[in-house]
């Protein structure tokens, strides 16, 4: 599930949640929900923003491919 991938990649890159929020322009609250799995089905725009900031493809993060 992508919740673990977001946190895993973010921490591997030494990014805080606050930093990822700032560079992706996705709120900390929203990112927290994604990482915890309490928010599902993010929009393609959100997935693209997060993926770009983590330097991964959307499919690598959200579809585990």
Give the residues covered by each predicted segment.
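A short, Lys/Arg-rich alpha-helix, primarily the initiator
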Residues: 1-12
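Residues within the helices of the helix-turn-helix
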Residues: 7, 18, 48
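The alpha-helix within a helix-turn-helix
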Residues: 10, 21, 51
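Residue-level detection of the helix-turn-helix DNA-binding "recognition helix"
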Residues: 11, 25, 36-38
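Short alpha-helical DNA-recognition segment
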Residues: 15-33
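DNA major-groove recognition helix of helix-turn-helix
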Residues: 35, 42, 46
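DNA major-groove recognition helix of helix-turn-helix/homeodomain DNA-binding modules
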Residues: 45-60
